[in-house]
Amino acid sequence: MSLKPTIGIETHIELNTNTKMFCRCAVVDTDEPNISLCPTCIGLPGALPVPNKKAIEFITLLALSTGCEITSKGMFHRKNYFYPDLPKNYQISQFDLPVGLNGELEIVIDENKDYIQIERVHMEEDTGKSSHSGSGRIESATSTALDFNRSGVPLVEIVTKPVISSSKQAVAYIEELRQLSIDLNISEGRLEKGNLRFDANISVAPEDSTELGTKVEIKNMNSLRSLERAIDFEIQRQTKALEDGVEIVQETRHWDENKEVTSTMRSKEGSADYRYFSDPDPVSYTHLTLPTITGV
């Protein structure tokens, strides 16, 4: 049986703003925990979020640079899930009205041009940071420390359509997107500092099938090398499973950099699991003027 892989990439880029997405707390780069906090970014009752105009401008700039259609009106939604580093128990994001839709990004591999289709570009606030004792995995940790300096930092999320067919294409796409964010001066794009993070959604299906296979999400890829190796491993794992008659389960898997394998983290959530609904607190906005792109 001839099989083909299909890959989609979700990328989060930390924006170069002085303050957080919905409050006036400074964006800080420090190892000292919990020094840039306020009632808004740690979700205390009664605190009202006010959107960061500069962050929305940066996201719009990236959306324009990738040829997206800019929505005339934007609004914010609550993405509901429960995790210790999410103090409100929901994340302010965007759902059916993102900043941009239906763009593309040109990549070059071995002097050959290709275009990766982008489904959407939208805003999302960052979570806090969890540090687990021991191996760094929550399953084996005896304690977990929480740092909320990062909570509420503005991110732009870029979601591709499932059009990538190899790890080489995926790496080329991330390299190009990273360079674009640096050229636009909207992010430092430093992987080692977590300015740019990415997850891969991978499925394998028969070559002649018009439908995609069961999607598996891969997390914890902290470098381009990790991205390439994790995708290659997961394609091989799913291919062997299908050839052996084993059903692929929709789930989220963790890339182990040392063992160079993926392992099950949890069942994969869908949009219904997050129970998106419009957030009544931050005001919606309208794109009255658009930023100008020069020299890119």
Question: Which sequence ranges carry the predicted segments?
Answer:
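Basic, nucleic-acid-interacting segments
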Residues: M1-L288
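Single conserved hydrophobic/aromatic residue that forms the stacking wall/gate
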Residues: H287-V296
